[in-house]
Amino acid sequence: MECICVIFRRPTADQALALAGVFQSAELVAKLATEGHVSEEQLSAAMSVLLNQNPETVSSLYGTVSGIELGINSMREMINDRTQASTDVMRYVIGIMYLARRLTADPVRIKQVGDGITNAKRQADHFSVTHENVIANIAGLYTDTVSTIKGRIQVTGNAFYLEQPAIAQRVRCL
């Protein structure tokens, strides 16, 4: 939760990186919703960030700039070239930010999310961060906690993909 929480503090380079991370997740959601897939590398990186609750720094979550390049490019595109795809991504970003703000104001729910992520991390250590059980666990955690907050995010895309349980679970994780 540290990565999202840092966005609401005084502007810093860490805030910019955290915001790029939110954009990156939103881009991956949009790609899953419209194309039905993201690369294993992208999914693994996003899941690793999610499971790292206590990073030394925000930049350590992403490694090199290439680890957050999709998010940085998405922010740049949002400013320079508004398309329907970028409009959807921006809507997801705003929804994520809204839900993160509401979540951080609820200590009981934030503890529940933290405990759930800790359990998923243990599971990922045993399997892998992209194992279907880890993804199902985090998707269930999202459904039980974050999705109960008023102001749900409506993901739009190809119904063929969005109706597939494995893709819906990945969307909830991201």
Question: What are the roles of these predicted feature ranges?
Answer:
Residues Q15-A18, Y92, G116, L141, ...:
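Alpha-helical structural motif
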Residues F23, E27-T34, Y98-R101, K121, ...:
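Alpha-helical repeat scaffolds in large eukaryotic proteins
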